Amino acid sequence: MKNYIISLLLSAFVFSALAQVSTPLSLGEGSGVRLYTLEQIKDSALHNNIAIRHARHSIEAAKEQRKEAFTKYFPNVSGTGLWFNANKGMAQTTVNPSEMISPELGASLAQMLPVEALAALSNPISISMMKNGTIGSLMAVQPVFAGGQIVNGNKLAKVGEDVRRLQLQLSENEVEKTAEQYFWQLASLQEKMKTIDAVDTLLRDIHKDVDVAVLAGVAMRNDLLQVQLRQNDIQSQRLKLQNGISIVRQLLGQYAGLTPHQSSTGEGSSYSFDIVLPAMNQQDNLLPSPFGEGAGVKLLPEYQLLDKQVEAANLQKKLAVGQNLPSVAVGAGYNYHNLLDNNHTFGMVFATVSVPISDWWGGSHTIKRRKIEHQQAQEQLEDNAELLKIRMQNAWNGVQEAYQQLQLARRSIEQAEENLRLNRNYYRAGTSRMSDLLEAQLLYQQSCDKHTDAFADYQNKLLEYRQAIGR
């Protein structure tokens, strides 16, 4: 009879708690706490994460490198200017006129010149020139043939820019994956807290009514102690969840680059945002089609990055060949100098041919090394392409397993609800103990938590699958 009385008091509260646990999570408005959806969290992370900013800076640097390589197609114009003033003339010599006069000329000069002049001709004369001067030139050189180094250098710079873009895409995938993992971890903990709240409400009502029954002498005090022990366990779980929610919220806020809330004392900051939780108990999570239309290894940024590595190795090989070929250039210049206190200008055109000779020996080994590196890149592409296919299949298997686990978790909730209902009836009929009813409640709580974990895991597996097939 006493069990029947208690069961009448508990029946309404049990179903009320079950309804609270099963209701999809939603957040009220007007609380002053900013709410973020999953897409907003990922968008914020993609805009503020340091890895993404670094990858974007790398793209800008690669663009400038490509533009720098493009300038090699145009003439190289250079100007040179020089002024000097030496302590003495740079061109000095001594001339002895007597050594330059033949005997016949000397006899004629002796008849024509005075004695003083003839004596001067016999003395050496010192000549000094170019003590100071000015030189200037303006040159333009246009490469005509450089062994393909300019063309291949530009292609290599373009490959470098493409590589940076692919690396950005990989960074975005990683940031998106991590942000979504944090999001679902926080959502899972908050959903478990909602379950704790519902169970705590149920246990408080059970405690109140069992306490009344004990005072009335229709229930044993042992039943009341069992309820109190379960309440203590729930409070312990609540403390752990509160700490976990706080830590994960801090991690998510920092990773997504959200603005922290400064404390009133100004001694620290914390994140006070919240997330918009999905309805985890709805039956609208359908299994996607395997390897949907357009899915393929060649669409993956990892494969494209390896393909760019092969292309870069091939261009490096061509550059090595070009460095050992003759180079031809033509040019024109305009020059000015004033070395003998006389301004002089002139223009000229020229052509140059540069042929590496001794470099051929070492260059031949460089070419062979580049060929080997190119072959290695091709083999690595083929090997990793197979690994990427395996990753795609593994990701699909993970989605299938997570989906099946989710369906099992949903069925477990239904079975746990029925088990709780039966134990309530058994307790009312006096054929079950309070420990059995509390055990049924615990099984229901565990089923809800497993469903929450299964739902979060399914969402993470879906993202991994989309990234694995290049979507």
Predicted regions and their residues:
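Small/polar, glycine/serine/threonine/aspartate-rich low-complexity segments that form flexible
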Residues: 80-139, 272-273, 277-282, 331-366
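Sec-dependent N-terminal signal peptides
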Residues: 4-13
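Positively charged n-region of N-terminal signal peptides that target proteins for export
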Residues: 1-4, 20
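A glycine-/polar-enriched beta->alpha junction
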Residues: 43-53, 60-75, 126-130, 138-155, ...
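Periplasmic alpha-helical coiled-coil/stalk elements that build and connect Gram-negative outer-membrane
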Residues: 36, 40, 64-66, 166-287, ...
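Amphipathic alpha-helical coiled-coil segments
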Residues: 54-69, 171, 177-194, 205, ...
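Acidic, low-complexity, intrinsically disordered peripheral segments
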Residues: 6, 78, 85-101, 260-263, ...
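Bacterial Sec-pathway N-terminal export signals of envelope proteins
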Residues: 20-90, 218-219, 256-314, 318, ...
